[in-house]
């Protein structure tokens, strides 16, 4: 059994926990969100599904996204512009984001140094980090 099949089984189990069935619509939404482009709004996901001739209502997409978030398949992103974006957590190790306030471009980055500093700060105050969200809002340097 490959990784994709394992994730689909886990998704089916999550749906079962929610007393829902794995329909062709939910399966298409799962594939689109998990294996499609990153950092997309619900509307972009709906548009992509329509282009692929998948008939899923916006309500079904939102409900499925909520389940994907609840069961840790997907991360919900608020980058401060009033629009929520979604990003798969499957196959994407922890990373942070830089968001350009002029263009909206989202740049992913990893810094072991920043991670270590955050852990040291938490420990210094008697805590252990269980999760964090690190977003840098940036502007291009004008030369």
Question: What are these regions, as identified by a protein language model?
Answer:
Residues 5-19:
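Short, Lys/Arg-enriched N-terminal segment that forms or immediately precedes the first helix
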Residues 27-32:
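Pre-recognition alpha-helix immediately N-terminal to the DNA-recognition helix
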Residues 36-41:
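Short capping segments at the starts of secondary-structure elements
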Residues 22-25:
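Short helix-coil-helix linker/hinge
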Residues 61-71:
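Basic amphipathic alpha-helical segments that dock to polyanions
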Residues 44-50, 61:
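A short acidic, leucine-rich amphipathic alpha-helix
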Residues 70-143:
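Non-DNA-binding regulatory cores of transcription-related proteins
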């Amino acid at each position: 059994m490959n990784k994709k099949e394992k994730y689909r089984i886990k998704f089916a189990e999550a749906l079962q926990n929610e007393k829902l069935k794995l329909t062709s619509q939910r399966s298409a939404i799962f594939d689109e969100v998990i294996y499609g482009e990153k950092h997309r709004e619900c509307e972009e996901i709906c548009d992509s599904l329509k282009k692929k001739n998948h008939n899923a209502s916006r309500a079904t997409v939102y409900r499925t996204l909520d389940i994907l978030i609840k069961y840790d398949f997907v991360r919900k992103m608020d980058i401060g512009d009033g629009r929520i974006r979604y990003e798969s957590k499957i196959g994407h190790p922890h990373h942070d984001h830089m968001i350009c306030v002029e263009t909206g471009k989202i740049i992913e980055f990893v810094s072991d140094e920043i991670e270590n500093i955050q852990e040291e700060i938490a420990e210094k105050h008697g805590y252990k980090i269980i999760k964090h969200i690190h977003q840098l809002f940036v502007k291009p340097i004008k030369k």
